[in-house]
From Swiss-Prot:
Protein name as annotated: Ribosome maturation factor RimM
Gene Ontology terms describing biological process: ribosomal small subunit biogenesis; rRNA processing
Keyword DNA repair found: no
Keywords (A to Z) from UniProt: Chaperone, Cytoplasm, Ribosome biogenesis, rRNA processing
Pfam families tied to this protein: PRC_RimM (PF24986), RimM (PF01782)
Length: 176
């Protein structure tokens, strides 16, 4: 069974002929050139052939086979855009795919204490990734995964060392 990787999210229809707007999480738009899979929530991954793709006002626009009008495109709102993990390009030595580090233990760089586990991620914009970290007592911390706040990702030990912005953890963890 293929393992899929989310590379984007359909946000809304565009125009009348069935195009959809996609917030892309991928560095390369070429990942959405021929075939993609769409998933609603935790439902099945459904394959679609990409008839055309183009960039418009900072977002990717896709025209998918079988999606021929705005009504059909509207039904795809908030669907995840995925590709098989095997189709991802090779990474540099210091790079990782977010899906490969889900489940890693997150520790504070300052004192080495465990904050929790990386359980999910989102990318409100292509330049801004947010990690969801679940603490041992079940609290959810939304963490800006900017380079200046991520000290190290150690794939061998499955740990991520972070340096949170001042006051961030207090917002989520106070009132315990």
């Amino acid at each position: 069974m293929d393992k899929y990787v989310q590379i984007g999210l359909i946000t809304k229809p565009h125009g009348l002929r069935g195009e959809v707007c996609v917030v892309s999480y991928a560095d390369s738009p070429f990942l959405m050139q021929e075939r993609i899979f769409l998933q609603a929530g935790k439902g099945p991954c459904v394959p679609y052939r990409v008839r055309s793709s183009r960039r418009h006002s900072g977002t990717e626009l896709l025209l998918l086979e079988g999606i021929d009008d705005r009504n059909a495109a509207e039904k795809l709102r908030q669907h995840k855009v995925l590709i098989p993990h095997a189709e991802l390009p090779e990474l540099e030595d210091d790079e990782v795919y977010i899906e490969d580090i889900l489940g890693f233990t997150v520790v504070l760089d300052e004192d080495g204490s465990t904050l929790g586990t990386l359980t999910a991620f989102s990318a409100p914009t292509p330049e801004q990734e947010v990690w969801e970290i679940t603490t041992p007592d079940g609290k959810e911390v939304l963490f800006p995964a900017a380079e200046e706040f991520v000290a190290e990702i150690d794939v061998d030990s499955e740990t991520i060392r972070i340096t949170p912005p001042p006051g961030l953890l207090e917002i989520y963890l106070s009132g315990s």
